[in-house]
Amino acid sequence: MTYLEFEKPLADLEGKAEELRALARKGEGVDLEKEAAALDRKAEEMLRDLYKQLDPWRKTQVARHPERPHCRDYVEALFTEYTPLAGDRAFGEDHAVMGGLARFKDQPCVVIGHEKGNDTKSRIFHNFGMARPEGYRKAIRLMDVADRFRLPVITLVDTPGAYPGKGAEERGQSEAIARSTEKCLQISVPLVSVVIGEGGSGGAVAFATANRIAMLEHSIYSVISPEGCASILWKDAEKMREAAHALKLTAQDLKKLEVIDRIISEPVGGAQRAPAEAIAAVGEAIAAMLGELAGKKPAELIKDRRQKFLAMGSKALG
């Protein structure tokens, strides 16, 4: 288990409990198992207390936790008959974006998401979930397929942001993001989105301009990273805590501002501690959101989506 900076006291406690268990297994103490169990109870209590008082910066750390379930984990657990589509038919394939045809609870659909990878090799292969223009154009291609065959679209967002490299900019990164966002607003089928980790900038919006948007309890969604914001506003990346607070990037803040529609509860300690439980909760939320849109006519779906985003910000402005 990888522990975050603020979880260090918890790591010490759980480490001591494991040491006692190791000694008990060797037969070096009769009551060590009881002592270990007592430490476990203290650790559980500490874990609950820590996650009850997460500030925006700590939530950012949790959202980035390397052991949180990623897009591929959700697809493998929640979807059947997944058939991936590759390439944008213009330049090439982008492994930061995965997507294809599938079935969700026996209903045919199209699923699209950012994939970060889960170890050094796969993270490099998937470019840490930072999509290039080809990824957004692949998503457009998939949304066109969904629109043609009247299939709902489900997107899973988990990206620090679109890739800012020279090659990506030369191939039209901003145009690709804009076209993907435009396509989200144009398709006449249900579109639901879940932010499962990081929802960074236009790279996230390009997949999440949806009829219904949900966020996991400890995920984040913002126009820029806290570090980037701090560097621009205060010329000091170390002010990321203040920036995280100012950005209103938590699911709780965004629900109040009516940017998102629902918050999906995570297991105590975050999705990384009980991935199967978190994945099941996301599946239930997707089913509920699709149920809300069932029976709506194509024109109603488009109107619903556009009005949702045109009205965005009215809550904050009063």
UniProtKB/Swiss-Prot annotation:
Acetyl-CoA carboxylase is a heterohexamer composed of biotin carboxyl carrier protein (AccB), biotin carboxylase (AccC) and two subunits each of ACCase subunit alpha (AccA) and ACCase subunit beta (AccD). It comes from Paracoccus denitrificans (strain Pd 1222). PROSITE patterns: COA_CT_CTER. It is an enzyme of class 2 (transferase). Its EC number is 2.1.3.15. Transmembrane segments: none annotated. Pathway: Lipid metabolism; malonyl-CoA biosynthesis; malonyl-CoA from acetyl-CoA: step 1/1. This is Acetyl-coenzyme A carboxylase carboxyl transferase subunit alpha. The keyword Cell wall biogenesis/degradation does not apply. Belongs to the AccA family. GO terms for biological process: fatty acid biosynthetic process; malonyl-CoA biosynthetic process. HAMAP family: AcetylCoA_CT_alpha. The lineage of its organism: Bacteria, Pseudomonadati, Pseudomonadota, Alphaproteobacteria, Rhodobacterales. The keyword Flavoprotein does not apply. Residues 38-292 form the CoA carboxyltransferase C-terminal domain.
